[in-house]
Amino acid sequence: MQQVRPNFSLISLILRKFAHQLITQMRIKYLILSIMLSLSATWNATAQDETLLNFGVLTRFDYQREYIDGSPIRENSGFKGKNLSIYFNGDLTPRLSYFYRQRLNRAHKDESFFDATDFLYLTYRPTDQWYFSAGKQTVSIGGYEYDLAPIDIYFISEFSNNIDCYQLGASVSFLFNDRNDELVFQFCQSPFRNIAEKEDTYSYNLLWSGAYKWFKPLWSVNMVEYAQGKFMNYIALGNMFSFGDASFFVDVMNRSVLRDPSLFLDFTVVGKFMYDICDHVSVFAKASHDHNKINSSGDPSVMPGTSITRAGGGFEFFPLKQNKDLRIHAVFCKTFGSNGNPEGALVDKQTYANIGLSWRMNLLSFRKKQKV
């Protein structure tokens, strides 16, 4: 009987291939482990004082009444959930930060989840003077009424009611004068892209903000595409003045169609006076006027034929000592004039009263431990 001898060359080949695969896998695992250890060491060395994560919730609940010429508007009266938002922000590296804020109370069938996202952007700071941001951010338009966060809005002008201020885009910022002044250039989606029904419409914005002893300007020049290839020009001048416990702002905005420039035919003026009676109580008075007498259509925010005024006031009470995260408010305003937009927010002979409770809750905060 013939003896069968093993094929040592075949066995040797199989063993060599197995050893090669094993060594390759070990090298890959070692490389991954080395990268992770390297990143960890770099993080520990450079991110000592960084905030990794802040997580919080913003909430506001109101009871309100609205009347038109003395007749109650039932659908806009009663208890209302005005704001329910969550936010995350922090540092990914010493030069790279992130911010995310989602409004949970904007759940409309014609909106996506991303439509209810206020902020979702990254900011890169190569130096202490230059900032580069990209993502969903506020359209950079001047004015202090426009600059209000949704949770702080009580009653606003027709212009501010009709502009979709959170859009995708990119911006570059330069800080100067000991960081007291900032210039921002921004390229983003048009705030009127939904009205134009064109995603491919844009806004080009240049914003200057400053902080001086008693004066804080918030000015901008904007070229806003309201229809495909058609632009509005904004000149928005926000001016904040502070004197002790009293402060007030005056916003002046002129709007004109680029093909037919005009001055003070289409404009909005807003003024607000605020006074801190004590650490717990603040009162304010506010008025706005929207005006558009341009014959041709073009401005989607304040339509032709509009000349409408809103005026009112209110108070804010902060129960916590040296903390304004919890707030109780009561406001009242009246509106009179004509609105060229039949579906506009401001209506002639409109009366509005509102009381409510809002609070800001910082639920979690993680910081990188300092290296000992």
Ranges and model annotations:
Residues 30-39:
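Sec-dependent N-terminal signal peptides
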Residues 3, 18, 22:
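Cationic, low-complexity basic patches in intrinsically disordered or flexible, solvent-exposed regions
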Residues 58-74, 110, 121, 125, ...:
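Outer-membrane beta-barrel pore domains
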Residues 49-62, 75-190, 209-211:
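Outer membrane beta-barrel
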Residues 43-49:
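Boundary at the C-terminal end of the N-terminal hydrophobic targeting segment
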Residues 184-233:
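Loop-centered beta-sheet repeat module
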